[in-house]
Amino acid sequence: MNKAIITVVGQDTVGIIARVCTYLSQHNVNVLDISQTIIDGYFNMMMIVDYANADKDFGAMVGNLEDLGDDIGVRIRCQREEIFTKMHRI
């Protein structure tokens, strides 16, 4: 299993989850866990995904997700789980 953490932050609008999940599904990335909330009109989502069977390499997926975020007006970041964990260790 190759896990990654995807975060999505921005002004809330219709279809954010649908667009992100559609991209992931189209490229054979499995969503393992998802949490989202809206705080005062701002959308926040964190996903744990498995990209082991993805049809794109990790770097291409990261770039595509950033571009998708630009298209829908949010900021999308994707990091390998081990990097995310090391960065957020207390």
From Swiss-Prot:
Pfam families associated with the record: ACT_6
Domain of life the protein comes from: Bacteria
All residue ranges annotated as the ACT domain in the record: 5-79
PROSITE patterns in alphabetical order: ACT
SUPFAM superfamilies, sorted: ACT-like
InterPro entries: ACT-like_dom_sf, ACT_dom, UPF0237/GcvR_regulator, UPF0237_ACT
Similarity comment: Belongs to the UPF0237 family.
Stated name of the protein: UPF0237 protein BL1209.1
Taxonomic lineage from the root: Bacteria, Bacillati, Actinomycetota, Actinomycetes, Bifidobacteriales
